């Protein structure tokens, strides 16, 4: 990972990132041997991401990409957009978690999420998003950031009201969605 990090640092530090965009390298928290170990995230507004894609060309990019391909393999490509973001801090991020779903009724699922978040108060920010393309038919995700390991390990309902809100969310969404699993990441470096 160190070699790839150096290649990424050399390339992404040498270009002027478009307004509002960032690229980050994240490590999967406790990935199994032989499974993906890192994720590259490209974040920003659509126009910024299109401009960033245009910058990813030329001799410098070709050299970077050739170097990365010696040590890394693309196993999946996903894209999505935030539908609802619950305010919270996204500074000093220790880690993040993404829960993936196949949703049959996005209006009901979204309403259940908003209802849950009126009661549940996490320390970091939480968002509901929609995959615009993925790999296994997943349609939506819930994404949460944590400012330290304790917040990540203690995530979940803390009060009777929060427990009740989670139970309502699961009872309202279980018939209209299928949970695909989750992944937890920790940041390695971000360029913006």
Descriptions of predicted regions:
Residues 1-192:
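Short S/T/G/P-rich N-terminal loop/turn motif that feeds into the first structured element of a domain
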